[in-house]
Amino acid sequence: MLTTWTPAHMPEKEEIKIRLQTARSQLYDFQMKIKEHKIPVIVLFEGWGSSGKGSTIGKVIKNIDPRFFKVATMSAPTAEELRYPFLYRYFKQIPEAGKFTFLDSGWMEQTCKDCLSGEIEGEGYTQRIDSIRRFERQLTDNGYLMLKFFMQIDRDEQKRREKLLLDHKDTRWRVSDFDKWQNEHYKKCAKIFSQYLSDTNASSAPWYIIDASDRKWAELQVLETMVSNIEVAMQNQAHSVPILQNVFPLEQIPRLSDIDLRDKTMDDEEYRGELKQLQSKLGELHNKLYRRRIPVIITYEGWDAAGKGGNIKRITEALDPRGYEVHPIASPEPHEKARHYLWRFWTRLPKNGHIAIFDR
């Protein structure tokens, strides 16, 4: 997308000033409508180092009540976060209905870094892109408004800004080694960025490339895009109809009525012998999956009083208590109900080498 992108004509300073006042006022008014309509908004800022992602976020949030937003800076994943699925730490950040989440970098930056380092390529890249597209589509299908901005500056402008930051000890920390590497390998990075933008540009979550060569012009582009999209989201919500969401292919299993339980019994002595043997085997497997860093999810469903709790107890007796967690799932709490249905399950996923047991 970057290779074919042409920046819009930048207006005169006086026009930018007038339009900024209008856009700021509109966003201030719309924040209450977002709350009333219970529309969750994710605003993702990606782009070149020193392109103004953080400063633009700072200007935008001045027009929103602090109670209605949060800002998350997604730096390099920690060793702990690397033990979870790639999208885990981003799913944790999604906002409640009626609120905003601003992300200073996100899944694009991490994916492009992995591509540039050679950590993912070919089939690995394709799988990553597929998972990102599903992730974004799940959210937008669930009523989330997702705004994705890429802050674009040329190589000379990036170098100029980095020099200004590096010349002062109080701002030197804002230029990372990767930012400097980006500028040295600008063409290589631009190729990766452009490919990623094309691969993840969807009608439900399109990319907006922002000409960030001028700070106020960049702020205006972001604000006007936010305002127009919020207005459309509220109109769409008023005319929305229920749709079948997130359909995945399922394995064929027998119907419950076709399962004969009459011969599924054994005497107590045989049961105790097999239980002891299988618990011993399960304990060995638990050690192996920890060494191989394999995460395991065990899910229980069934009628009340069907024996789920007792079965879980007999399984956990064989496991190292440091390597598993049992999650009883009841009706969602208000803060859970205000987010995507899967949020409360994503936040309970096991890290690699561990087991999560869901009681429903």
Segments predicted by a language model, with ranges:
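Glycine-rich phosphate-binding loop of ATP-dependent small-molecule kinases
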Residues: 1-360
